[in-house]
């Protein structure tokens, strides 16, 4: 392979990797422009090494190692915050950037361009569709989700904490408060336990976690938790 052919393959990998990275950078993701570009260039370099090695009898060996190696980098951008897992789409984009770079290293430019376009369509065009689907209730099964929230607060702040809890729950759509009870934990009324039973027409784990996190910041709240109970079909 001539040096100008290697330069062409690396340049195409640079351009396509940057294209994928711009979309991630625009959404302010952890792995953005530079990361996706470097992944594509690195994958292309490894494949070029394989091509330049005349005695290499297994042309798929290097791409297989690239697929394995990119898993460590992709795993580093996946974060778990409470019940929410973030970074899965960014990790998948990194994986695709490695594939695009591998194609460029092999000189398969048409396939690399087509793959990049498909990744961009998946990240941009399918985003509104996935958001729309996530917000749709499950009409066919009409699931009814039950939750139970517990919190312990100071007795003199019970009324204020109950008000904050009710106001926070009121901001969540399709949710009903089944009961709200409280009882003293000691005879001197130093601490009170408040228990709220909630019914939703769909899973509201993320919203309840936000409510609980907000209440936990209140200095008068000693402890707070929530749990999902059984799901009943209507």
Curated annotation (Swiss-Prot):
<feature type="transmembrane region" description="Helical">
    <location>
        <begin position="32"/>
        <end position="52"/>
    </location>
</feature>
<keyword id="KW-1133">Transmembrane helix</keyword>
<dbReference type="Pfam" id="PF21770">
    <property type="entry name" value="MgtC_SapB_C"/>
</dbReference>
<dbReference type="Pfam" id="PF02308">
    <property type="entry name" value="MgtC"/>
</dbReference>
<dbReference type="InterPro" id="IPR003416">
    <property type="entry name" value="MgtC/SapB/SrpB/YhiD_fam"/>
</dbReference>
<dbReference type="InterPro" id="IPR049177">
    <property type="entry name" value="MgtC_SapB_SrpB_YhiD_N"/>
</dbReference>
<protein>
    <recommendedName>
        <fullName>Uncharacterized protein slr0014</fullName>
    </recommendedName>
</protein>
<keyword id="KW-0472">Membrane</keyword>
<keyword id="KW-0812">Transmembrane</keyword>
<dbReference type="InterPro" id="IPR048640">
    <property type="entry name" value="MgtC-like_C"/>
</dbReference>
<feature type="transmembrane region" description="Helical">
    <location>
        <begin position="62"/>
        <end position="82"/>
    </location>
</feature>
<feature type="transmembrane region" description="Helical">
    <location>
        <begin position="106"/>
        <end position="126"/>
    </location>
</feature>
<dbReference type="GO" id="GO:0005886">
    <property type="term" value="C:plasma membrane"/>
</dbReference>
<comment type="similarity">
    <text>Belongs to the MgtC/SapB family.</text>
</comment>
<keyword id="KW-1003">Cell membrane</keyword>
């Amino acid at each position: 392979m001539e040096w100008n052919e290697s330069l062409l393959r690396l340049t195409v990998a640079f351009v396509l990797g940057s294209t994928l990275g711009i979309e991630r950078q625009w959404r302010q993701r952890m792995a953005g422009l530079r990361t996706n570009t470097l992944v594509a260039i690195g994958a292309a370099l490894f494949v070029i090494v394989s091509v330049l090695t005349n005695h290499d009898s297994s042309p798929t060996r290097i791409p297989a190692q690239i697929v394995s190696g990119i898993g460590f980098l992709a795993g580093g951008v996946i974060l778990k915050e409470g019940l929410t897992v973030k970074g899965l789409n960014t990790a998948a984009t990194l994986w695709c950037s490695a594939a695009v770079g591998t194609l460029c290293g092999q000189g398969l430019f048409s396939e690399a361009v087509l793959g990049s376009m498909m990744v961009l369509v998946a990240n941009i065009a399918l985003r509104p569709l996935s958001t729309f689907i996530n917000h749709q209730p499950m009409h066919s099964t009409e699931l009814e989700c039950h939750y139970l929230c517990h919190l312990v607060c100071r007795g003199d702040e019970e009324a204020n904490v109950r008000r904050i809890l009710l106001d926070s729950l009121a901001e969540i759509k399709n949710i009903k408060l089944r009961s709200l009870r409280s009882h003293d934990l000691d005879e001197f009324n130093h601490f009170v336990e408040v228990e709220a039973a909630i019914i939703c027409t769909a899973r509201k784990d993320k919203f309840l976690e936000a409510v609980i996190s907000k209440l936990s910041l209140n200095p008068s709240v000693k402890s707070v938790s929530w749990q999902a109970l059984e799901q009943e079909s209507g």
